[in-house]
Amino acid sequence: ESGQGSINASVLMEGTFETPIYAGHASIKSGSLRLASIQEEIEDIQARLDISGRTVQISEGNARIGNGTVRLGGGIILIQDAPSQTNLQATFSSVRLRPNEDLDLTASGTLNLMGRVGSLELVGDVELLNLHYTSNIELDDMLRKKAKPLPLPGLSPGEAWSLRVNVRGENNLLFTNN
């Protein structure tokens, strides 16, 4: 995993360490990010974060993944001695993802991540413009009872994610296997 780009930030902290108040902004220009979880590089990252009091607002956020585009917006409220409150939106168009060699998909849609950290909800609509899955499906492996449940990374006891995402794909899903 790696990233690059030009980062400019100006942040002022007032008050005490127990009750700090922040003001300022941060921006990223000509950024790029490579994640181990997807083959595509996230490019042309342009973002501006405005910080006021205990609120971080994304006033501008754009990137390109493959030939597709992503727009980000929303904000986070930093709550003292409590989980932060999140309301983030992503709108994406013709984004191609290849999370592994067996799956290639292109999608458009809108996703919102809302709630307090530890109890987040992902809501939205995703249209699969095309999906091609090429891995062999072994029914014995799928139906065999697992000895223990699969672990969920990033969640502590008592934390949860709620998912309400509508996924639609009409006449463009291709499964090549067995």
How would you describe each model-predicted region?
Residues 1-57, 73-178:
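Membrane-proximal interfacial segments on either side of biological membranes
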